[in-house]
UniProtKB/Swiss-Prot annotation:
Annotated organism of origin: Evasterias troschelii
Glycosylation sites: N84
Family stated for the protein in its record: Belongs to the Wnt family.
Compartment(s) of residence: Secreted, Extracellular space, Extracellular matrix
Gene Ontology BP annotations: canonical Wnt signaling pathway; cell fate commitment; neuron differentiation
GO molecular function list: cytokine activity; frizzled binding
Keywords: Developmental protein, Disulfide bond, Extracellular matrix, Glycoprotein, Lipoprotein, Secreted, Wnt signaling pathway
Entry protein name: Protein Wnt-6
Gene Ontology terms: cellular component: extracellular space
Function statement: Ligand for members of the frizzled family of seven transmembrane receptors. Probable developmental protein. May be a signaling molecule which affects the development of discrete regions of tissues. Is likely to signal over only few cell diameters.
Pfam families: wnt
UniProt modification remark: Palmitoleoylation is required for efficient binding to frizzled receptors. Depalmitoleoylation leads to Wnt signaling pathway inhibition.
């Protein structure tokens, strides 16, 4: 007589918070690169940075300085932008408001959400 066993395996997605945290870590550790002459190599602009792997986050152009007026946009005011007044990180009011000060306003709203995952 023989026996039969069945094993089923699957991978579980991490929580959105964990995914966001991992992306933020990669964002903070990202390196600016230029393309190599062979069309497939990425070369770090900073010679002290190791060449990126396929899993590293890289960028090729600097982000615009949103604190400086841009003649291509209609206005450069950052009014109505949500920020975290206690954070000293990228979402903090001091950074988002370019050190020009900000007014704190508490807004409470209710949203019906029928999210499914």
């Amino acid at each position: 007589s023989g026996s039969c066993t069945l094993e089923t395996c699957w991978e579980k997605m991490p929580s959105f918070r964990e995914v966001g945290s991992r992306l933020m870590e990669q964002y903070k550790g990202s390196a600016k690169v230029t393309g190599g002459n062979d069309g497939g190599t990425l070369i770090p602009e900073d010679s002290t940075v190791k060449p990126p792997s396929e899993l590293d986050l890289v960028y090729s152009m600097d982000s615009p300085d949103f604190c400086e007026p841009n003649p291509r946009t209609v206005h450069s005011a950052r009014r109505g932008v949500g920020c975290n007044s206690t954070s000293m990180d990228v979402g903090g009011c001091d950074i988002l408001c370019c050190g020009r000060g900000y007014v704190e306003e508490t807004v409470i709203f209710q949203v019906n959400c029928r999210c499914r995952f």
